[in-house]
């Protein structure tokens, strides 16, 4: 079975011609490039046998440098040396300044509220910085492979939302890359481990990098990779370990950095200390006029809450997947931060088994991406690997009464397309507003708005006669497109969802938790809203009928009786007693039964007026 080859980009009709393709692990701290060469998947190394390329760009007066050269400028020129741009991508300036107040950069806001970093070469967006990194990786890969790349697979955290994924694709396009696919980092690791070890069963992929954390629960069976559930934190990683350790060192030295250069030097020292403590139980540290010893135990205490935070996310992912901890067959460790002994110990205790670390955790994602790229570019058309990712949050549409109708439920396998049919609410309605929502709650006010568009040109008919088919489609990169079409005329409108910025980790967590804690209240609110909608429809229908035929077929007393029932139902509708509203609808229906019969008789009389008996028969 081919890997979702229905219409994968990058594939051609000439499968026997070997094409150059690479997998790019675009990391927060470091990036890597890997490729399949002579049947072997390898990470590309530079002239000094180094695999890791720092995800750093330095914008100098005369030139721009990327990678190791740029990283060397971090302490010398911190305001023009952009590190961890991946943390900023797809976020608003307000979010960035709140979340990362200690960054040494000078920010200004773009027209749509996104952050721009002021550098010697002008204002740079996180997308442009990422594009510069990708351009560097592209040149490096083409130099190593000796030819032009036909396509790339770029990995992203599984919990990246639409804005962050789209921003990553925009960066790749700016860099001139042909993106075959965006691939979730944990899924890429599963590909690498699944092909190497042939494991089957449920596995957990614990991915703790420099700036992001992801957990994925996957089922591996007969070459099929199915993601059962994902969870993550887009603002948790090894960088946070560094900041905690840096603060501790500053406190011990009784000295706070006085400028951006000293702050960068302190962070560099903290990173070096963290790495040393992964090998030794204690290490010497010198900062300002202070010299002392930091033990692994002290470091463990500093990062304990952050590690526990990651394990809470793991617990939610297990619940979402519907599996117990003991069902996990293997735990795959991904990301350089999983080298920290305390992280490995805590993860091992949580899952009750020793984590897998046989593949270099820094390289495993790039290796999996390279395998995927080799298939998508057409070099392995007979591959039997099937990869199934999932939608992390439900996608829905607003309906009458401020309700949310879920079109694609959370954890549906992607790519996926789902459609539902809706109708008009008013007589003569010629347009319909489509409000696209994301979240797990029942009411619009409790979900996240992704976008709106209007379908115009609906033929004017009585309410409920027109049929509008709304289709939601999530592609392999997790990007959403929504189309609304009126079935009789085929008139349609659509939207490609590209939010201006992404969800914070707190918002993602809250959206999931609140759907559980408020489930009962949400359902009661939904039932009340649905009853109010039914009341509105009944009232509108009766008022329209009265305007058309009431004066002709009803006595004054009958007319007033129906008006009184309408007024009563309008009053009941303002309250919160669902049963009372339902009874009001029944009372109005009962009060209009005679009116309905008289309207039917009147309609028959008008239809037969002036016609001979033989014409009717």
UniProtKB/Swiss-Prot annotation:
HAMAP family assigned: HscA (MF_00679)
Entry keywords, A to Z: ATP-binding, Chaperone, Nucleotide-binding
Role according to the record: Chaperone involved in the maturation of iron-sulfur cluster-containing proteins. Has a low intrinsic ATPase activity which is markedly stimulated by HscB.
PANTHER family hit by this protein: HEAT SHOCK PROTEIN 70KDA
Gene3D superfamilies listed in its UniProt record: 1.20.1270.10, 3.30.420.40, Actin, Chain A, domain 4 (3.90.640.10), Substrate Binding Domain Of DNAk, Chain A, domain 1 (2.60.34.10)
Statement: the UniProt record of this protein carries the keyword Transcription regulation: no
Gene Ontology biological process terms from the UniProt entry: iron-sulfur cluster assembly
Gene Ontology MF annotations: ATP binding; ATP hydrolysis activity; ATP-dependent protein folding chaperone; unfolded protein binding
Entry-linked CDD domains: ASKHA_NBD_HSP70_HscA
Organism of derivation: Actinobacillus pleuropneumoniae serotype 5b (strain L20)
The keyword Acyltransferase is annotated on this UniProt entry: no
Cleaved signal peptide residues: none
UniProt name for this protein: Chaperone protein HscA homolog
Superkingdom as given in the UniProt entry: Bacteria
Pfam families reported in the protein's UniProt record: HSP70
Family to which the UniProt record says this protein belongs: Belongs to the heat shock protein 70 family.
NCBIfam families: HscA (TIGR01991), PRK05183.1 (NF003520)
């Amino acid at each position: 079975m081919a890997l979702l080859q229905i219409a994968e980009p990058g594939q051609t009709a000439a499968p026997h011609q070997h094409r150059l393709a690479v997998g790019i692990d675009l990391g927060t701290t470091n990036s890597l490039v890997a490729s399949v060469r002579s049947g072997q998947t390898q990470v590309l190394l530079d002239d000094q046998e180094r695999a890791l390329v720092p995800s750093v760009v330095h914008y100098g007066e005369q030139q721009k440098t990327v990678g190791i050269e740029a990283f060397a400028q971090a302490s010398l020129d911190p305001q023009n040396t952009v590190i961890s741009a991946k943390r900023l991508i797809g976020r608003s300036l307000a979010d960035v300044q709140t979340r990362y107040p200690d960054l040494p950069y000078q920010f200004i806001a773009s027209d749509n509220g996104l952050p721009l970093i002021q550098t010697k070469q002008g204002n740079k967006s996180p997308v442009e910085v990422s594009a510069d990194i990708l351009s560097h990786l592209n040149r490096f890969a083409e130099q190593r492979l000796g030819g032009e790349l036909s396509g790339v697979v770029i990995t992203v955290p599984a919990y990246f939302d639409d804005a962050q994924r789209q921003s990553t694709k925009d960066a790749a396009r700016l860099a001139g890359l042909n993106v075959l696919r965006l691939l979730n980092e944990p899924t890429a690791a599963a590909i690498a481990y699944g092909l190497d070890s042939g494991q089957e069963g449920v596995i957990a992929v614990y991915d703790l990098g420099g700036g992001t954390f992801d957990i994925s629960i996957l089922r591996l069976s007969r070459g099929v990779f199915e993601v059962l559930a994902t969870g993550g934190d887009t603002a948790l990683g090894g960088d946070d370990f560094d900041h905690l350790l840096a603060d501790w060192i500053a406190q011990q030295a009784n000295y706070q950095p006085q400028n951006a250069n000293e702050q960068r030097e302190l962070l560099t020292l903290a990173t070096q200390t963290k790495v040393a403590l992964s090998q030794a139980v204690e290490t010497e540290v010198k900062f300002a006029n202070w010299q002392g010893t930091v033990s692994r135990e002290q470091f463990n205490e500093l990062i304990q809450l952050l590690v526990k935070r990651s394990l809470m996310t793991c617990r939610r992912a297990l619940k979402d997947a519907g599996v117990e901890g003991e069902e996990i067959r293997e735990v795959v460790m991904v990301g350089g931060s999983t080298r920290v002994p305390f992280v490995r110990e805590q993860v091992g205790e949580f899952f009750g088994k020793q984590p897998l670390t046989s593949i270099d955790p820094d390289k495993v994602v790039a290796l999996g991406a390279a395998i995927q790229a080799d298939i998508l570019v057409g070099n392995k058309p007979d591959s039997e690997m099937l990869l199934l990712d999932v939608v992390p949050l439900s996608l829905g549409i607003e309906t009458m009464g401020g309700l949310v109708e879920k079109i694609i439920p959370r954890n549906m396998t992607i790519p996926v397309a789902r459609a539902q049919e809706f109708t008009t609410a008013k007589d003569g309605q010629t347009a319909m507003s489509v409000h696209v929502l994301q979240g797990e709650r029942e009411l619009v006010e409790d979900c996240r708005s992704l976008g709106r568009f209007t379908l115009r040109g609906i033929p004017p008919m009585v309410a409920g006669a027109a049929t509008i088919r709304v289709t939601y489609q999530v592609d392999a990169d997790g990007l959403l497109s929504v189309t609304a079409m009126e079935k009789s005329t085929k008139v349609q409108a659509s939207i490609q969802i590209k939010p201006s910025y992404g969800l914070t980790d707190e918002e993602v967590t809250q959206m999931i938790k609140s759907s559980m804690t408020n489930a009962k209240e949400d359902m009661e609110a939904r039932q009340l809203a649905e009853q109010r909608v039914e009341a509105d429809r009944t009232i509108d229908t009766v008022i329209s009928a009265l305007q058309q035929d009431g004066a002709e077929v009803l006595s004054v007393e009958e007319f007033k009786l129906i008006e009184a029932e309408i007024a009563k139902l309008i009053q009941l509708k303002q309250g919160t007693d669902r049963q009372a509203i339902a009874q009001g609808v029944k009372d109005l229906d009962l009060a209009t039964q005679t009116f309905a019969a008289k309207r039917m008789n009147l309609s028959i009389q008008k239809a037969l007026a002036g016609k001979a008996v033989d014409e009717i028969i």
